[in-house]
Amino acid sequence: MELTSEEYEELRGLLGTPDIGNADTLKKAFLKACKVHHPDKGGNEEAMKRLLYLYNKAKIAASATTSQVWYFLIIGYISLKNKNIYLPKIFWLRFQNMAPHSGNSGGKNSIKALMSKICIVMRN
């Protein structure tokens, strides 16, 4: 359940940001936009409903991607440790494309470190 390009543009407009960025900037922009669009603060009720819908959809898509990345990391780590599990090259290409480029720094560094180990082993 990912955002379409139209929904992405609409969310950017409602948030008032040029780019959504990572989860932290998305949340900050969302909270700021809630103050603008909330009906109790003089905002439009329909705009607020749409903002909530698009924000939740973006969060679900982001968490699904994060779950997929961790799944691939775990499978890759098992294959790295056992050295007896062969995974096709397409798996690794897909995995590399899914690696997050932004987000909270806690998981980002560990993902990058493990991914680089897995990719080095697969190249050899």
Curated annotation (Swiss-Prot):
Known role: Promotes efficient viral genome replication by accelerating both G1 and S phase progression of the cell cycle.
Domain remarks in the Swiss-Prot or TrEMBL record: The common region of ST and LT proteins comprises the J domain. This domain is essential for multiple viral activities, including virion assembly, viral DNA replication, transformation and transcriptional activation. This domain is also required for cyclin A-transactivating activity of ST.
Protein's cellular compartments: Host cytoplasm; Host nucleus
Predominant location category: host cell
Gene Ontology CC, one term: host cell nucleus
Source species taxonomy: Viruses, Monodnaviria, Shotokuvirae, Cossaviricota, Papovaviricetes
Domain J: 10-96
Keywords from the named record: Activator, Early protein, Host cytoplasm, Host nucleus, Host-virus interaction, Oncogene, Phosphoprotein, Transcription, Transcription regulation
Name of protein: Small t antigen
Source organism (scientific name): Bovine polyomavirus (BPyV)
